[in-house]
Amino acid sequence: HPGSVFKPVVAVAALSEGVIDENYTFNDPGVITIDKYSYSNWYFTQYGSTEGTIGLTRAIARSTDTFFYKIGELTGIDDLVKWAKKFGFDKETKIDLPGEISGLVPSPEWKKRVKNEIWFLGNTYHVSIGQGDLSVTPIEENQAISAIASGGELCSPKIAAEPKCKNMDIKKDYIEIIKEGMIDACSTGGTGYTFFDFTPQVACKTGTAETNV
């Protein structure tokens, strides 16, 4: 599972589908409960604390799970899947190296076909923080984050050839707000503490996934 490094993709999806805007805020409850299931933020789980009212840049910097549960719910799994595939997930990148495999972006149709189970909101929550049945390869993740870094140009990674790039038609303002959140993640108060005093300034996104072994 990619874990929280997938959250910038979810942010692009939510902004591009118009379910949130740059000024959207969310009051972090620490944990969201649906029936008998609880979906918590890491900060609440570890320290019993909440983030208060936060916007998108802060949510990226602090990797606030509850924020991404909510915007993932607002976006809906169909559009999350659509945007994940736009970023190159669920298929090989065609890097010029042998042995590449693709990851998996789960959907309600996939779950019904493979597991004979229906899709629940909790499944959408898991995808929204890069967990559940979502799986990606390191090169897929590199390609996706590079698209954000380059201002919305998705380029096929190459070792010994010129990459082929295509514009993803993501609004520049959306790219910039996500970059700002990733810069804040590497700054004091963010989650990327190893980069707090790093020179030159960098942008990053931390991620810690849970998986059964």
Please annotate each region the language model reported.
Residues 1-4, 12-213:
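Beta-lactam-recognizing serine transpeptidase/beta-lactamase-like catalytic domain environment
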Residues 7:
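Short, conserved phosphate/pyrophosphate- and ester-handling motifs at nucleotide-, phospho-/glycolipid
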